[in-house]
Structure formats: C-alpha cells, structure tokens
From Swiss-Prot:
This is Pantothenate kinase. One of its GO terms (biological process) is coenzyme A biosynthetic process. The keyword ATP-binding applies. It comes from Streptococcus gordonii (strain Challis / ATCC 35105 / BCRC 15272 / CH1 / DL1 / V288). NCBIfam families: panK_bact (TIGR00554).
Length: 306
C-alpha cells in the first residue's frame, strides 16, 4: 500500500458484501442492462455484493448530515434550509463512472421512499468545440482548461441553495455541446455529479469542487485495463457510427480498421493517458470511497477513508 492510501481502510469484496443483509435486488436484469455503459460489465450479483452495502453507507452519511444541520439550527436559533445530498463520482474515461452513477440513481430512488434523485455529467460544462478551436484547445478536450469551471461552480452553488438550474447538454454522437438544448436539474433529495474533473481544483478559484460534495466516489482500475476498455469502447462506437452518417465517428468508418485502431491507441497515449496521470488520478485520494475494478470489470477492492 502506498502512502496515498494510508488514510483509507482497504476492504475486500468478500468482507464488503457481508456488510449488508441478503435481500432481493431492487431492480431487474433488464433494468440493469439498460443503464450500463455498452462497454461495461455488471451483474445483479455486483449490485448485491457492492452497491447495496454502498447505499447503506450513503444512508449513514445522509443521516449524519441531517443531524448536524438540525444541531446547527438549534445553535443558530433558526431553521436551516434543506439541502440536497450531493454525490461526486470521478475516474478515468472508460472506467465505468456512468454505470456506477446511473445504478446509484436507481438504488437511491428506491431505497429512500419518494426520494427524487437527479444525475448530471460534467460533459455539459465543456466549452463548445467552436470555443475550443478559437483558443487552440480542441486537442486538449477533457483537460482542465477545456471546462467552464466557473459555470460548474455556479451550478453547484445553486444546488446547495436548493435552486433549479439549467445545464448545457453534451452529445457523444456529435462530439459537442448541443446548441440551444439544456437539462433542467430540479431541487432534489440527491444529486449525483459525474465526471473526470469533479475532484479537480479550478484555477484561480478559492472554492474547491469537493467542498460541495457530501459523499464522493472514485472508480479505479489498473491503467492497462482502462486502455483495453477504452479501445473496446472506441471499436463499438465505430460499429454504431457505420449506420449513422450524422455521428461524429462516422467519418472514421471509411478507413481501414487497423488504421483507425492505431489512431485510437495514439489518442489514448497522447491525450487520455496523460490526462489520467497528470490530472485525474492525482485527485483519487480526495474521494471518500474508492471502488477498484479488476480486469473483468468486477469490483475486487474497496477503500474507505478513515
């Protein structure tokens, strides 16, 4: 164990799954398949072993937050405004953040009766391609400078104050922000914020994004596994794009597969791997919980901050 994990408790999958009583999964196999990323692997057994104990843990943190707010209100002699419980989910591209986030959205909405759970990805806070091109940043897309961090902080501030907010919508099909389209994030009991940059500190800002989170999760894996998953996903995106001329990846389908996959490997090494090592992975220890995935996508270890 490196020094980075000294303030974490390492918990094996076998030990973790014992922290929740055996029960029926609160979703079906069909529902699970519908929410998983198309290059990801997850089973109902994973839901039972990993995510139901995690939901219990989140319940403990939520109760502690409410107790603190109640006590603080007594001390200040006023009623404090109810705030959503905000969960940050981070990790590399292609590691399975989206699957984790969508699954948590379902589990929380069914664990807490009548709970409203919103999910937003930070892809919507990328600058549009036109802005990135204007500032010669298109090849830095996904790096910290390609995000409108001021807008992201403003969004989180509105969330904390119990206010609705309209966020831009990003499309992987067109590889850009969708013009004139927004997603309204309404006042909710839980808000899950998912993205590679959610633990990063905005430049020249006194506020840290993690200051807004009540709980935070980093989805982790060995670099060689993430690279394989990234290339698998790229290949599947190409297959989908062959049938859709409007898809951003359609332009690549006319080239030999070997050439395109060579390009994908170069993109991984020159962009995604650099971003992971320089900006994403260094934020890992800011998470409250780390879910480590093995080569088969199965979570084999959990690290919980002491």
């Amino acid at each position: 164990m490196t020094n980075e994990f000294l303030h974490f408790d390492r918990i094996s999958r076998e030990r973790w799954q014992q922290l929740h009583r055996k029960t029926t999964p609160p979703l079906t196999e069909e529902e699970l398949n519908s929410i998983k990323s198309f290059n990801d692997e997850i089973s109902l057994q994973d839901v039972m072993d990993i995510y139901l104990p995690l939901t219990n843990l989140i319940q403990i943190y939520k109760r502690a937050k409410e107790d603190l707010a109640f006590s603080k209100g007594i001390f200040l002699q006023k009623t404090l405004k109810k705030q959503p419980f905000i969960i940050g989910v981070s990790g590399s591209v292609a590691v399975g953040k989206s699957t984790t986030s969508r699954l948590l959205q379902i589990l929380l909405s069914r664990t807490f009766e009548n709970a409203k759970v919103e999910l937003v990805t930070t892809d919507g806070f990328l600058y549009p391609n036109s802005v990135l091109q204007e500032h010669d940043l298109l090849n830095r897309k996904g790096f910290p400078e390609s995000y409108n961090m001021e807008l992201l902080l403003n969004f989180l501030d509105h969330l904390k104050n119990g206010q609705n907010y309209q966020v831009p919508v990003y499309s992987h099909e067109i590889y850009d922000i969708v013009p004139d389209q927004t997603q309204t994030i309404q006042v909710a009991d839980f808000v899950i914020v998912e993205g590679i940059n959610v633990f990063q500190n905005p430049q020249n800002e006194r506020l840290y994004i993690t200051d807004f989170f009540d709980f935070s999760i980093y989805v982790d894996a060995e670099v060689e596994n993430i690279e394989k998953w990234y290339l698998d996903r790229f290949g599947k995106l190409l297959d989908l794009a062959r049938r859709d001329s409007k898809n951003y990846y359609h332009r690549f389908t006319k080239e030999p597969v070997e050439d395109i996959m060579k390009m994908a490997r170069n993109i991984w090494k020159s962009i995604n791997l650099v971003n992971l090592k320089d900006y994403i992975e260094p934020t890992r220890n800011r998470a409250e919980l780390i879910l480590h995935k093995a080569h088969n996508h199965e979570i084999d270890e959990i690290y919980l901050k002491k």
